[in-house]
Amino acid sequence: MSTSDQKRETIMKRSLLVLAMGVALSCTACAGGSDTDKVNGSISVSAGQPATDVSTVNGGVRIADNAQVKSANTVNGGITLGDGAQAAELDTVNGSITLGAKAAVSGTVETVNGGIRLANGADIKGKLSNVNGDINLDSAHIGGGIETTAADITINGSSKVEGGIHVQKPSGMNFGGSNKVPKIVIGPGATVTGALDFEREVELHVSDRATIGSVRGATVQKFSGDTP
């Protein structure tokens, strides 16, 4: 099965999961569900609360500075992990994901339609992935690589991405922005280990002070200074 087919299958499964979550969470709500398990409405987690799974269907998730959760999931809404906060995984369908300074995720970070931003010192042990939406790293770390279809990617400061970068070709499904040529910028001082693998046309700009692995499917455009 091709990577594009796998992505289609993943999103089909995700759509079914949305329906299942709606039914299950509706039943929970009828029974007086907790503030960390909703159908409609945003969720906020304060520091000092016991770490638990948090999920909603229609609403954002805000995890305060230095707070802890297990997984944080929503369907229609963004997720914010505050400065120094910790989570096992972050997952949304339609919404952005933001990690504050020194925030840490021990697993994966994934959105379908939404940007992802990592502040100084943020750390993701697993993979970071999306389909659409800009990906921005500012002196952050990713242990499991970056995967996208149509995102512009900017890797700045002392950021280190282990596991490479994989840009998939668009599938037959029409995701907004999939016809736009993604722009990949690896700035001065940044490091990407592993392969940079591009299945579609991209603009690949790499600082003469950056370190990268092997490149397949794109031509490196070197630049000096802070930006291309």
List the predicted regions and their residue ranges:
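Intrinsically disordered, low-complexity terminal regions
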Residues: 1-228
